[in-house]
């Protein structure tokens, strides 16, 4: 609702346009939470495969479907899914598999104590090459903020949610 993921997706589009290998990794949302940005980036990945324009796109869902509105409904706990997802991303970073990584809602597993912040920071600081990592979410750990190149805080001034309106197709997803 505040634009954190949408802003990061804009950066992913820029990376794609430069021919970078783009990976989007959703750490809280499940595969059932379908957003327009996913369709757009997948279509751009397909365009790359067919024409060579832009770069390849990877989209992976690491979350179990847990949300603030309902409990998780997967065989794997949200904590285990976050740890497994981070291990996967760490391996991709170590092997320079991508040029641009969007770790969507990745601050939450750190804030909730599901991931070791020191280990995450060490992995990011020591990643090889010139890989770019964008992390979204609130409550970023101070250690992460200190090593980041850019930190942005999205602040809602006014939103239709405030007057009881539900999310709108085309606006929130």
Positions of predicted regions on the chain:
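Short, glycine/charged-enriched secondary-structure capping and boundary segments
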Residues: 11, 37-41, 115-119, 147-151, ...
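Conserved nucleotide-binding/hydrolysis micro-motifs of P-loop NTPases
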Residues: 28-32, 65-67, 107-108, 139-142, ...
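Structured helix-beta-strand junction loops
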Residues: 44-47, 130, 147
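Structural signal for conserved beta-strand scaffold positions within catalytic alpha/beta enzyme cores
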Residues: 58-61, 135, 152-153
């Amino acid at each position: 609702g505040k634009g954190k993921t949408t802003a990061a997706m804009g950066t992913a589009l820029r990376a794609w346009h430069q021919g970078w290998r783009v990976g989007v990794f959703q750490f809280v949302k499940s595969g059932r939470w379908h957003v327009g940005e996913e369709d757009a980036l997948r279509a751009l990945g397909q365009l790359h495969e067919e024409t060579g324009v832009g770069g390849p796109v990877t989209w992976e869902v690491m979350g179990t479907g847990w949300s603030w509105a309902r409990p998780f409904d997967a065989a794997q706990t949200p904590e285990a899914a976050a740890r497994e997802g981070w291990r996967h991303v760490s391996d991709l970073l170590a092997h320079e598999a991508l040029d641009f990584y969007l770790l969507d809602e990745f601050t939450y597993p750190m804030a909730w104590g599901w991931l070791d912040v020191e280990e995450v920071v060490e992995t990011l600081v020591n990643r090889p090459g010139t890989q770019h990592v964008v992390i979204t979410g609130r409550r970023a750990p101070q250690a992460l903020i200190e090593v980041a190149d850019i930190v942005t805080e999205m602040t809602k001034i006014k939103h239709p949610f405030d007057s009881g309106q539900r999310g709108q197709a085309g606006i929130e997803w």
